[in-house]
Amino acid sequence: VERDPIKTSFEKWAKPGHFSKTLSKGPNTTTWIWNLHADAHDFDSHTDDLEEISRKVFSAHFGQLAIILIWLSGMYFHGARFSNYEAWLSDPTHIKPSAQVVWPIVGQEILNGDVGGGFRGIQITSGFFQLWRASGITSELQLYCTAIGGLIFAGLMLFAGWFHYHKAAPKLAWFQDVESMLNHHLAGLLGLGSLSWAGHQVHVSLPINQLLDAGVDPKEIPLPHEFILNRDLLAQLYPSFAKGLTPFFTLNWSEYSDFLTFRGGLNPVTGGLWLTDTVHHHLAIAILFLIAGHMYRTNWSIGHSLKEILEAHKGPFTGEGHKGLYEILTTSWHAQLALNLAMLGSLTIVVAHHMYSMPPYPYLAIDYGTQLSLFTHHMWIGGFLIVGAAAHAAIFMVRDYDPTTQYNNLLDRVLRHRDAIISHLNWVCIFLGFHSFGLYIHNDTMSALGRPQDMFSDTAIQLQPIFAQWIQNTHASAPSLTAPDATASTSLTWGGGDLVAVGNKVALLPIPLGTADFLVHHIHAFTIHVTVLILLKGVLFARSSRLIPDKANLGFRFPCDGPGRGGTCQVSAWDHVFLGLFWMYNAISVVIFHFSWKMQSDVWGSISDQGVVTHITGGNFAQSSITINGWLRDFLWAQASQVIQSYGSSLSAYGLLFLGAHFVWAFSLMFLFSGRGYWQELIESIVWAHNKLKVAPAIQPRALSIVQGRAVGVAH
């Protein structure tokens, strides 16, 4: 650690652009404000010193954590101050969650709908109520305390960010000590983090949820600290607590099976995963990561060395294998970030799919709006992270890649046969696009000609997803075969099991897959492959291409390769990120359409006392979604028309947002299709008029560059 490396100066920070010689001189044209935003956090452009860059990134992480904690604190505060949480807790099947009441200004109070129990407010779909119930929060006071705790923690984070940059800044060697970092992150963050959460679940969540499920009034349930301090209270609910740690040390672990279970399926009272299953899961995860956190060699001569592992990693056809990658990952934070974003993005999308198929919190499964919101949220976040991975991989290629140290290793070999990779990927995209779209067009044509017997459908020419059905079947039959102690499969969606209904609403049931899913699946494959094609091309051609051999010298983002080189605009790595983002939006839109229609058609709905299920859209997915016309008529129009007709009701905000979102979308296209010269000419005639009237601005207006225009377009 280096002491007092940089003094704290508010005067310096107050000056816009203090991090750059050019920008700190102040504005000449309006481009200055764009560059200010573009470069403020581009630490590479402030200095070449890797240690200084590392310290800035490290310090910024604390700031990021502070922002997250302040946001979370706000969520908990709203739950404490403005919500009907206690009412919802006492009757979660009839009362809807609300944590915002609109003030009566210019008639906006129309937005406050009746959410049940005499409470009028906006219904929320964030899933916080369900999460709070699962973690054992029973009163608004507890939410207040947590909110205050969050703010205190945020303050600590802000202090830590300042302290570790201005007072005690780590040296470069500390940032590059990967084995120590792996040990501490795996054992500390993931291992002890999971263990402490498992502990909280056992001692607080389990007993409180057990009593809530049994219908005990939340106000009569003992407070969390009483369960922790008084073991007899827990022993009344879970008898093995009376035995203490004896079964643990005598290896009779099965004694604890009253609160560490392996049941599978859902709790029929709440429609959520069995809390005893999730405790068991977190305990197991903790053990795994605590072991993993002792695997890497630091002060003693045992354990893995990452450099040795990477350099030993050679295949028969891969030349030098992973030699040289260790140096890349310890000197290029962009390369490190690219890998982490790709993995975290993929994981986030996996989470999106588990939130509905294995709903982790009580009553989450019957709150359809929240289910849809959580799925959409996690899909979008995952998409952004994956595009970010490609962006930072390209920045690594332009700024940090040194071809002289990477000879005949895997990265070098991938770069050398990039033409084969990209052209094959291109062929795959063409194949998927024409075939998947062709299946729909065929169906539309046959439908229009009145020949249903010649359509691809479950009732005519079947294209059943046999592999997906085989996987479903394997999982559905697992409990009796591979997991004999489990009473149900991991997810009810696999099949076999009965449906779970809570409060006359379907929580979950086996999801049938048919021709319609097979068709839309190939649209997913198509859009994902196009996204990958664009992003990967951006990375592999970031340094050079046949068109522009010296691309690396032009940087990560540039509009064109100078005058006289026609057709070289929009070829920078940045432009590939832009186009990739565009296709990521395309891909995720189809995913969200598929999810919301499939769930409304085949899963969500009400159940009568006789056990008859009525789905929201009456099971029309299998026959309607096999034509383009069906998607337009029975999904997009059928659902959008309800939103558009919401004016004058408490849902009117959504109608206005719907309209506004399309306006913003159209606005973005204006920037994307704009001709820069056209705007520059327009601006200059307007400036001339200002000059005539002696009201000309001191800062000369300038049309957006291509890169800036695309930035505005993509943001909208």
Swiss-Prot record:
UniProt key word Transmembrane helix: yes
Protein family (similarity comment): Belongs to the PsaA/PsaB family.
UniProt: [4Fe-4S] cluster binding residues: C560, C569
GO molecular function annotations of the record: 4 iron, 4 sulfur cluster binding; chlorophyll binding; metal ion binding; oxidoreductase activity
Residues binding chlorophyll a, per UniProt: M670, Y678
GO cellular component, one term: photosystem I
EC number: 1.97.1.12
Cofactor binding, per record: P700 is a chlorophyll a/chlorophyll a' dimer, A0 is one or more chlorophyll a, A1 is one or both phylloquinones and FX is a shared 4Fe-4S iron-sulfur center.
Keywords: 4Fe-4S, Chlorophyll, Chloroplast, Chromophore, Electron transport, Iron, Iron-sulfur, Magnesium, Membrane, Metal-binding, Oxidoreductase, Photosynthesis, Photosystem I, Plastid, Thylakoid, Transmembrane, Transmembrane helix, Transport
GO BP annotation list: photosynthesis
Oligomeric and partner information: The PsaA/B heterodimer binds the P700 chlorophyll special pair and subsequent electron acceptors. PSI consists of a core antenna complex that captures photons, and an electron transfer chain that converts photonic excitation into a charge separation. The eukaryotic PSI reaction center is composed of at least 11 subunits.
Binding-site positions, phylloquinone: W679
Organism for this UniProt entry: Araucaria araucana
Name by which UniProt lists this protein: Photosystem I P700 chlorophyll a apoprotein A1
Enzyme class: oxidoreductase
Reactions catalysed, as given in the entry: reduced [plastocyanin] + hnu + oxidized [2Fe-2S]-[ferredoxin] = oxidized [plastocyanin] + reduced [2Fe-2S]-[ferredoxin]
Record: residues binding chlorophyll a': H662
Subcellular location: Plastid, Chloroplast thylakoid membrane
Domain of life: Eukaryota
Biological function: PsaA and PsaB bind P700, the primary electron donor of photosystem I (PSI), as well as the electron acceptors A0, A1 and FX. PSI is a plastocyanin-ferredoxin oxidoreductase, converting photonic excitation into a charge separation, which transfers an electron from the donor P700 chlorophyll pair to the spectroscopically characterized acceptors A0, A1, FX, FA and FB in turn. Oxidized P700 is reduced on the lumenal side of the thylakoid membrane by plastocyanin.
Membrane topology, record value: Multi-pass membrane protein
Parts forming coiled coils: none
Transmembrane segments: 57-80, 143-166, 182-206, 278-296, 333-356, 372-398, 420-442, 518-536, 576-597, 651-673, 711-716
